[in-house]
Amino acid sequence: SATAGANGLTLLPYFEGERTPNRPDATGVFSGMNLNNSNPADIARAMIEGMLCGLVDAVDALEQLGVSINRVLLIGGAAKNPAISSIASSLFGREVLVPQPGEYVADGAARQAAWALMGGATPPQRNLGEVTSTHSAGTPEVVSAYRTLRDRTTNW
């Protein structure tokens, strides 16, 4: 029920360091907490947004390498929650697809190995079956607040 930006509450969810960007010793940080946003809804929203903003950083890193990303495939238990896929779409600023449960990580690893072994040839494609698609208006201000906090804490 919380609004985008969790009423000014931002979380860097670095509970075990962070991989994107590579900060293995980083720690988690809640920023902007006050009496108005220290409620379960805003805390949950900040946690979801923080986790997803880490994925936005990964997408941005790929784009900086010249990879064109038009949509995002969201997998895992949390992806089944329509609120999370909607928040993800607004943070990514692009379509989010949620397939039926499957072994997508193992399949992706096998496809990547096949691609590497075949010298860059196109790996076999997988039919995702029935897919739920979500596309929401972007919320760049949430990503901006996350990145500001991330950058401010780089040397912690």
Residue ranges and their predicted role:
Residues 1-156:
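Glycine/Thr-rich phosphate-binding loops that ligate phosphate moieties of nucleotide
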